Amino acid sequence: MSLNRPVQPHDLLWGMPVAALPADAPAWVSDVVGLGHPVVVRRAKVAEGWVAVGVRGRSRDQRFAAVMKLSDVTRCIKPEQLVDAVDHVEADWPALCALKHIRPVLDAMHLPWGVAGSAGFELATSIKVLHQDSDLDLILRAEQCFSRHRAAALVEALEGAACRIDLQLQTPLGAVALREWAGSARHVLLKADDGARLVSNPWQLQERAA
């Protein structure tokens, strides 16, 4: 397929061929890929024409890092495309109940946001991976500086949800946890393609490696 936009971390990609897996890949990885399940884009430096991906299995400890040719991608779903999907499923797990509850709060940010992690995977595939204790993983794209005061207000607005919410602010330089940015620490951990580093401003690259 022709990708109209660059792939980004947390995008779900279809089309990974089993033959592209390394020889040391566990059997469950080959099984999952063979079933046509999507892989998720992760942060890592790769050669041009390739993308770093992760394969997820049934359990939390089943995660496998791999790389995929962009030319093999047959379908791409971004976290933002999954927000409306919650309207068409039974919200029988806390993570989905929380998503429905906090949706107006995030819509009020007037910034692109989406669903990642287990909730995003289940909404995109209808494969049952959520459980009673699943967190709700979200992303919020903030191309411009998202103030610490605004971050703290958002953390407060998300309190009381049916499950723990892990929201990552996606900046042009990487990702930072909303709760960490809303805190009082001078430096926060910025996760980028070339590694993690402690920064005082996730929108300005200037700092030291973690």
Feature annotation, model-predicted:
Residues 121-125, 132, 180, 190-192, ...:
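Generic structural "secondary-structure junction" signal
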Residues 159-195:
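Conserved catalytic core of two-metal-ion nucleotidyltransferases
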Residues 57, 142-144, 171:
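Non-catalytic surface loops within mature trypsin-like serine protease
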Residues 71, 75-76, 187-202:
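Mature, function-bearing regions of proteins
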Residues 1-118, 151, 155-163, 167:
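Helical scaffold of the NTase/Pol beta-like nucleotidyltransferase catalytic core
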Residues 210:
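Expand to "…catalyze enediolate/carbanion chemistry for C-C bond making/breaking, isomerization
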Residues 147-149, 176:
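Short, charged/polar "capping" segments at the starts of alpha-helices
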Residues 103-136, 140-146:
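Active-site nucleotide-donor binding segment shared across nucleotidyl transfer reactions
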